[in-house]
Regions:
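Aromatic-lined ligand-binding clefts that engage carbohydrates, nucleic acids, or primary amines
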Residues: 138, 142-157, 190
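Extracellular beta-strand-rich recognition modules
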Residues: 31-36, 144-148, 188-194
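Exposed beta-strand and adjacent loop surfaces of beta-rich binding modules
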Residues: 30, 46-48, 143, 153-155, ...
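Beta-strand-rich ligand-recognition modules
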Residues: 13, 155-204
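Accessory carbohydrate-binding/adhesion or oligomerization-edge regions at the termini
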Residues: 1, 46-48, 54-120, 135, ...
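Subset of Sec-pathway N-terminal targeting signals
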Residues: 1-62
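Extracellular and analogous surface-interaction loops
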Residues: 17-27, 132-144, 180-185
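Extracellular beta-rich ligand/substrate-recognition surface
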Residues: 4-13, 120-130, 167-172
């Protein structure tokens, strides 16, 4: 992965290359970098170059954004309340897994219509639960804040650990709840459950 800064005229340029996998060992490592300069103007010069290797997480924390994978939904399930577990809670998420419910078999479905930062209607019916899942890819360990909204109740897990719960009856709006996510390097698994006690339903 490459991050670049310094795009203005007469401004120093900086490029940061992030390795996809860790490298290096106690006996030493050899790193080869090839640089090529191309310009349509003959007077352009490559300039001075300084190379350095670092294990600092400063760039990944400040400059490299998180990668948010697609949303998936599971349900709706007839429910007795927010505490009722319909299968995926507290366990590794398997998007191929099927869940029996009321004589039917429910499976995870990709939801390409969900856009972050917007309120989405779920239309799941009275006294039902719906699960929402996505993977969050992080280059490093970092803490982020998650803003949520729901109609009605909501519960959130990260990597199988519960991080937020609000058993409430309300209409959905932006920024009704906040959760803190302690992300680890690599894939992080975010699971949410929305319970509709009656009327409209949705999430933010």
């Amino acid at each position: 992965m490459l991050f670049r800064s310094g795009q203005k005229k007469r401004e120093n340029r900086q490029a940061v290359f992030l390795a996809e996998t860790p490298f290096g060992h106690a006996e030493g490592s050899s790193l080869r970098i090839r640089l090529k300069h191309q310009s349509q103007h003959a007077q352009h010069q490559f300039g001075r170059v300084r190379l350095a290797v670092t294990s600092s997480g400063a760039y990944t924390e400040k400059e490299i954004p998180l990668k948010l994978e697609d949303w998936y939904s599971l349900g709706p399930f007839p429910t007795e309340g927010l505490s009722q577990n319909h299968g995926p809670e507290g366990a590794p998420i398997d998007l191929q897994q099927a869940f029996p419910s009321g004589g039917k078999v429910l499976k995870w479905a990709k939801e390409t219509k969900y856009v972050d930062g917007q309120v989405h209607n779920l239309s799941i019916g009275d006294n039902t639960s719906l699960y929402l899942y996505r993977s969050i890819q992080s280059q490093s360990s970092r803490r982020v804040s998650l803003s949520l909204g729901s109609d009605d109740a909501i519960k959130v897990w990260l990597n199988q650990a519960q991080v937020m719960v609000n058993d409430v009856n309300r209409g959905v709006a932006a920024d009704q709840d906040q959760a803190v996510l302690d992300l680890k390097p690599g894939a992080n698994h975010l699971l949410m459950k929305v319970v509709n006690y009656g009327g409209a339903s949705g999430f933010y």
